[in-house]
Amino acid sequence: MKVCQKYTAVLLVWLSAVVSMRAGAVDLPDFTGLVERTSPAVVNISTVRKVGDDSAQYYFGGPEQDQIPEFFRHFFGDPYRRRGPQEAQSTGSGFIVSKDGYILTNNHVVAGADEIFVRLMDRRELTAKLIGSDEKSDLAVLKVEADDLPVLNLGKSSELKVGEWVVAIGSPFGFEYTVTAGIVSAKGRSLPNENYVPFIQTDVAINPGNSGGPLFNLEGEVVGINSQIYTRSGGFMGVSFAIPIDVALDVMNQLKDTGAVKRGWLGVLIQEVNKDLAESFNLNKPRGALVAQVMKGSPADKAGLQPGDVIVSYNGNEIGLSSELPHLVGRTSPGQKASMKVVRRGDEMDVAVEIGQLPADDNGVASVPAGQTAPQNNALNLQVRDLTDEEKESMQVAGGVMVAQVFPGPAATAGIQPNDVISSINNKDVETVAQFHEVVEKLPVGKSLPVLIIRQGNPAFIVLKLNNK
């Protein structure tokens, strides 16, 4: 009897543990219903590019492939693969957004194409017309003529939360209607050379061929367009990026209405604020976008912005990282008034600006070595010289001093290099060698001091600290 009671007690404990584990477990989502509802409106996109020898040249990514950095690659298949005339090859994905046949995809999927073909899940193959494309956002709008087209519901990427489940459907490596799932890893990611898109980062498996396909939330609404991956192998490594559908809709509507996208323009070059820069500009913590240069005649110039200003808010949106500012400005309509909060020498102020239209291109500047050097006899241990008139014109600056030689000391520790141009020190303009020595002689010791330099045509602030002698 005692033995039975003993085994009964053990059995009850074991059953209790099993029930407890089941109660604590979280059921994984079932994607089957979502996939069945949405797949018919996902399409496979093929392109043909005609070449001089009457053969066909097919692209996974367009003619700009060689210019795209290895670090963030668009999705390409076998580049520059030749086939017979008019032979098509799968290049990417897209999805239907309206009953009258409008389709969203990536610009790099259709860039350089002479003909575009769309294949639906019901095996219909249609010729698509390119309505418009936008390289800066990597988006393109196509249109097909057909009846009874399935359409996807569009969600709001602004309501997407980190940790939320998301699903991708596309044609990786030509395997049509492949379904992968994961979670939102981060929002508002800024990628190199992609200033105007706050990307959604996910761990959804994305590979060549998924490009242009939809990213769904659990309600089956499109919240993003799969666009890029981080890879060192050419394939998926757990980091994928999607264009928010809110951004895509704005671009699509402009392309449909006018065939082009107008973006707001402020006319500043900005950089990140680190701990040392925050201290030198009297900020309580690293935040905002530090203005390194104000372009002459730009909206920022007309509004009175200055190098050294830190933009901490734009139209009520707090700027934590400098990368958050460009896409906010870009989505502001040209001619619209915008309000900013700016910290200047430790004091916060309100600045109103009328946003301009982003120019088609943005030319850089270059420096030309020349001129006479001044002896190294200053607290920074630098040898500097005046800029020539040709250098000033080339760099579009009123003045500054060129660093001829750097000796061990505070400037070397701060990272100043030969051929750097010093424009200001501790928020004091430096236009000549004489001004340079005058400013340096009055620098306080033991404090973090901002120094504005121009290096290879690019302005940037660095932090200098003079130690007690």
Swiss-Prot record:
<protein>
    <recommendedName>
        <fullName>Probable periplasmic serine endoprotease DegP-like</fullName>
        <ecNumber>3.4.21.107</ecNumber>
    </recommendedName>
</protein>
<dbReference type="InterPro" id="IPR001478">
    <property type="entry name" value="PDZ"/>
</dbReference>
<feature type="binding site">
    <location>
        <begin position="266"/>
        <end position="270"/>
    </location>
    <ligand>
        <name>substrate</name>
    </ligand>
</feature>
<keyword id="KW-0378">Hydrolase</keyword>
<feature type="active site" description="Charge relay system">
    <location>
        <position position="108"/>
    </location>
</feature>
<feature type="binding site">
    <location>
        <begin position="209"/>
        <end position="211"/>
    </location>
    <ligand>
        <name>substrate</name>
    </ligand>
</feature>
<feature type="active site" description="Charge relay system">
    <location>
        <position position="211"/>
    </location>
</feature>
<dbReference type="InterPro" id="IPR001940">
    <property type="entry name" value="Peptidase_S1C"/>
</dbReference>
<dbReference type="Pfam" id="PF13180">
    <property type="entry name" value="PDZ_2"/>
</dbReference>
<feature type="signal peptide">
    <location>
        <begin position="1"/>
        <end position="25"/>
    </location>
</feature>
<keyword id="KW-0732">Signal</keyword>
<dbReference type="InterPro" id="IPR009003">
    <property type="entry name" value="Peptidase_S1_PA"/>
</dbReference>
<keyword id="KW-0720">Serine protease</keyword>
<keyword id="KW-0645">Protease</keyword>
<dbReference type="InterPro" id="IPR011782">
    <property type="entry name" value="Pept_S1C_Do"/>
</dbReference>
<feature type="active site" description="Charge relay system">
    <location>
        <position position="138"/>
    </location>
</feature>
<comment type="similarity">
    <text>Belongs to the peptidase S1C family.</text>
</comment>
<dbReference type="GO" id="GO:0006508">
    <property type="term" value="P:proteolysis"/>
</dbReference>
<comment type="function">
    <text>Might be efficient in the degradation of transiently denatured and unfolded proteins which accumulate in the periplasm following stress conditions.</text>
</comment>
<keyword id="KW-0677">Repeat</keyword>
<keyword id="KW-0346">Stress response</keyword>
<dbReference type="Pfam" id="PF13365">
    <property type="entry name" value="Trypsin_2"/>
</dbReference>
<dbReference type="GO" id="GO:0004252">
    <property type="term" value="F:serine-type endopeptidase activity"/>
</dbReference>
<feature type="domain" description="PDZ 1">
    <location>
        <begin position="255"/>
        <end position="346"/>
    </location>
</feature>
<dbReference type="InterPro" id="IPR036034">
    <property type="entry name" value="PDZ_sf"/>
</dbReference>
<feature type="domain" description="PDZ 2">
    <location>
        <begin position="352"/>
        <end position="457"/>
    </location>
</feature>
<keyword id="KW-0574">Periplasm</keyword>
<dbReference type="GO" id="GO:0042597">
    <property type="term" value="C:periplasmic space"/>
</dbReference>
